[in-house]
């Protein structure tokens, strides 16, 4: 009975059988509305499974610093809560505690490429699919670092460091996930997608997500983020 992991998939066993379809299930102290496929495996990416219509749904992007996990939760009109786990992924958060201000914000403007010059090192870096977290001092959600404005200029070490406190103000995620957030905001318009910064040690609906369970680290010298849609062409 309860949650089971098998072959990289996650199931919920009730009365000796895995749940199928939509179900309210408890995880890490909260109840969420999960979707399980016909074989009973939890569908961990509702956007990929159900298509673009899900990118237009009311949602909150929860950024959890202690667990280095982003949980995208959809609004449930029946419970009046953001309790539908759409996707969870690994993140790098700011090094300084003061640069990560907890609270509720909105995602506003977007940039296909964002450049940032570190005030300490004076080094300029480039990031793909950047979305501004309005209300924070300077945070954006974007890809890992690039050494030039090119999809083939990935700073592979920063990709491999996903899942730590290593950024200045921003929230770094895999390129494919940065684009997902960027696209959701594109569909919904500025200020419609909510974002929450949390310092809670409680894990979310999919637990702690790491680079190890997100495709693993890339080889030294890798030039493209493996999750980048451009890498799949």
Spans of model-derived segments:
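Well-ordered beta-strand positions in beta-sheet-rich domains
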Residues: 3, 10, 22, 33, ...
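Conserved hydrophobic/aromatic positions in well-ordered beta-strands
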Residues: 11, 34, 71-73, 131, ...
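Exported/periplasmic cell-wall-interacting domains
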Residues: 114-233
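Intrinsic-disorder/low-complexity loop/linker signature
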Residues: 8, 29-30, 40, 80, ...
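Extracellular adhesion/carbohydrate-binding repeat motifs centered on closely spaced tryptophans
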Residues: 1-57
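Short, surface-exposed beta-edge/turn micro-motifs
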Residues: 8-10, 31-33, 56-58, 67, ...
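Gly/Pro-biased beta-strand-loop elements
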Residues: 50-152
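Short, flexible beta-strand-to-coil junctions
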Residues: 8, 15-16, 38-39, 63-67, ...
């Amino acid at each position: 009975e309860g949650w089971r992991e098998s072959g990289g998939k996650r199931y919920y066993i009730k009365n000796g059988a895995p749940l199928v379809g939509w179900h309210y299930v408890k995880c890490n102290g909260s109840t969420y509305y999960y979707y399980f496929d016909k074989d009973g495996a939890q569908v961990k990416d509702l956007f990929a499974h159900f298509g673009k219509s899900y990118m237009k749904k009311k949602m909150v992007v929860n950024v959890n610093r202690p667990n280095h996990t982003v949980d995208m939760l959809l609004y449930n009109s029946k419970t009046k809560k953001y309790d539908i786990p759409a996707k969870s992924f690994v993140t790098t958060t700011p090094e300084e505690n003061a640069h990560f201000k907890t609270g509720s914000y909105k995602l506003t403007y977007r940039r296909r490429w964002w450049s940032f010059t570190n005030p300490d090192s004076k080094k300029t870096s480039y990031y793909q699919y950047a979305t501004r977290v309005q209300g924070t001092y300077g945070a954006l959600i974007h890809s890992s670092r690039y050494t030039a404005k090119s999809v083939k200029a990935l700073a592979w070490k920063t990709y491999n460091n996903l899942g730590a406190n290593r950024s200045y103000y921003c929230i770094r995620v895999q390129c494919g996930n940065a684009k997902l957030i960027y696209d959701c905001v594109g569909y919904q318009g500025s200020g419609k997608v909510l974002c929450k910064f949390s310092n809670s040690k409680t894990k979310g609906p999919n637990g702690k997500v790491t680079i190890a369970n997100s495709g693993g680290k890339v080889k030294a010298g890798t030039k493209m983020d493996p999750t980048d849609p451009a890498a799949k062409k």
